[in-house]
């Protein structure tokens, strides 16, 4: 998703 969190 955001790039700086471990999510797409």
UniProtKB/Swiss-Prot annotation:
Superkingdom field: Eukaryota
* Crosslink feature (Cyclopeptide (Met-Pro)) location: 1-8
Instruction: Give yes or no: UniProt keyword Transcription.
Output: no
Which molecular function term from Gene Ontology is one that the record holds?
toxin activity
Q: Per the record's keyword annotation, is rRNA processing included, yes or no? A: no
Q: Which UniProt keywords apply?
A: Toxin
Concerning PTM, the database record says: Processed by the macrocyclase-peptidase enzyme POPB to yield a cyclic octapeptide. POPB first removes 10 residues from the N-terminus. Conformational trapping of the remaining peptide forces the enzyme to release this intermediate rather than proceed to macrocyclization. The enzyme rebinds the remaining peptide in a different conformation and catalyzes macrocyclization of the N-terminal 8 residues.
What is the recorded function of this protein according to its Swiss-Prot or TrEMBL entry? Cyclic octapeptide that belongs to the MSDIN-like toxin family responsible for a large number of food poisoning cases and deaths. Cycloaminide B is non-toxic to mammals but shows immunosuppressive activity, probably through the inhibition of the action of interleukin-1 and interleukin-2.
The name on file for this protein is Cycloamanide D
Q: State the organism's lineage.
A: Eukaryota, Fungi, Dikarya, Basidiomycota, Agaricomycotina
């Amino acid at each position: 998703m955001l790039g700086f969190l471990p999510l797409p």
